Amino acid sequence: MPCRREEEEEAGDEAEGEEDDDSFLLLQQSVTLGGSTDVDQLIVQIGETLQLDAAHDRPASPCAAPGPPPPQVLAALPADKTGTPARRLLRPTGSAETGNPAPPGAVRCVLGERGRVRGRSAPYCVAEISPGASALPQQPGLDGPPGTGKLSTPQPLSGPCRRGWLRNAAASRRLQQRRGSQPETRTGDDDDPHRLLQQLVLSGNLIKEAVRRLHSRQLQLHAKLPAHPFLGPLSAPVHEPPSPGSPRAACSDPGAFMGRAQLRTGDDLLVPGS
């Protein structure tokens, strides 16, 4: 029937209009703003309305535990004579907390100073652990209260943790063995200079190896040199006196040399004496 369809459509439109009206906040009377005190009172009223609407329509947060109710807005403080704006105070009710306290270690949501009204100042749900026993598991290495710091016997690992630990231990043991046997392989691989150079570059001991070889070569050269009496330190050279029969002594002291020499005549030849 066309009449019934029209009535049903009108009823559906009215229901949708009522739902739309419920989703908006309408002011029943106009307010004339005369000063900062009126503005603060209007803000407090809007906050109360939004808080009640949010608590009535929206379900509780998934991370919220059955704990204290949302904080209630106290009456606004009256402005003083100088005209400074009044501030609103937020305080959770103590009777609800004492009657139904949250269990120790429970996680609850902290939405900031505006209670459950989520704005730019508190847009996220911050998890807070209530005082009491910690919700986290106790560390296996500590025994007793956290403040004592007593060590307990470590429990053996099981499953994939044990396999990963054994794999890491075996890898570290192989690495230590490789580092310990590195000097032996170095002495055996002296015949291959390219491989030795590659190992030194990868290990970062190229400069140390060069200094060690230079020092050992210098020691070998000092060991091969013969012990000469005239060799001495460069800072204090040794000057030996010239021998009496050397031409250097004759040039330095010709009178003494001629006095020491004795001439012998024989076969018309001059022979210097000894």
UniProtKB/Swiss-Prot annotation:
Involved in GSK-3 binding as annotated region, ranges: 191-214
Database matches in Pfam families: GSK-3_bind
Disordered: region residues: 1-24, 55-107, 132-194, 232-274
Major location category of this protein: cytoplasm
Record's subcellular location: Cytoplasm
PTMs per UniProt: Phosphorylated.
BP terms from Gene Ontology: canonical Wnt signaling pathway; embryonic axis specification; protein export from nucleus; regulation of protein export from nucleus
Record key words, sorted: Cytoplasm, Phosphoprotein, Proto-oncogene, Wnt signaling pathway
Expression sites (tissue/organ): Highly expressed in testis. Lower level of expression in spleen, thymus and brain.
Biased composition range(s): Acidic residues: 7-23
Phosphoserine carried by residues: S243, S246
The organism's place on the tree of life at top rank: Eukaryota
InterPro entries, per the entry: GSK3-bd
An example Gene Ontology CC term for this record: nucleus
Illness: Activation contributes to progression of mouse T-cell lymphomas.
Quaternary organization: Binds DVL1. Binds GSK-3 and prevent GSK-3-dependent phosphorylation.
Family according to the record: Belongs to the GSK-3-binding protein family.
Role this protein plays: Positively regulates the Wnt signaling pathway by stabilizing beta-catenin through the association with GSK-3. May play a role in tumor progression and collaborate with PIM1 and MYC in lymphomagenesis.
Protein name per UniProt: Proto-oncogene FRAT1
Organism of provenance: Mus musculus (Mouse)
Taxonomic classification: Eukaryota, Metazoa, Chordata, Craniata, Vertebrata
